[in-house]
């Protein structure tokens, strides 16, 4: 049996369709997953056996063009299997067989990566399709004339805070993109404040990034209201100088201010947080399809 050239392998056997992934490589990846084979230490003999059995079952049902690709891959696997089974002492031939085997493994790993990426992009596309774009609005009309507006504590960058908030809400909603309506869940401000401080106290050097704190929060009973309240609590703690911050790349490093933290929380500060969070809407609606999981 004549060996197939490297160029033939690259041009025919390893082609894939970006959306459907219906071809020889996709079949091999499915077989590897079903048989729980180690793709990094692939047993070519077992894989070729499983693949040939699959092609034999497929011959009478599959389109002739697609079948041709599968037959070419089956032929290549049988050739590689035969070369591996034949005894040889030629080091160059042994190295050639191992190179071909490793080339197949590398192609499968690369293909599987593209496949996973395609599935991720598909999920992102479906999630984005559930959202609606609004034109830029002027929010000054919603400002209360008799309210006292204070600047952000210690000159925090509002754009960084916005990026963090957008990222947190987006990732949370991506995990729950089938939710249609989020019911109101009441949060205890004092407990949430304690939750944050305990997390920082237990972190190395009593410091952690804002994103890492939100990442470890359980999805259950967490919605936009929760994240808005937590953001206000963080700002209040910074304003009270109970936690310090350091700017990172689109994030903030929060650190316990040991000199100011006390176990008995100031009730007036807690009341301040409650007053701020009470202005949050109580009928939060997210434009997602499905049922509520809270």
From Swiss-Prot:
Q: Which residues form the signal peptide?
A: none
Classification via Gene3D superfamilies: 6.10.250.2410
Q: Is Cell division included in the keywords of this UniProt record?
A: yes
Its primary localisation, in coarse terms, equals cytoplasm
Keyword field: Cell cycle, Cell division, Chromosome partition, Cytoplasm
Query: Oligomeric state and partners?
Result: Component of a cohesin-like complex composed of ScpA, ScpB and the Smc homodimer, in which ScpA and ScpB bind to the head domain of Smc. The presence of the three proteins is required for the association of the complex with DNA.
List the PANTHER family: SEGREGATION AND CONDENSATION PROTEIN A
Q: What's this protein's name?
A: Segregation and condensation protein A
What gene, per UniProt, encodes this protein?
Answer: scpA
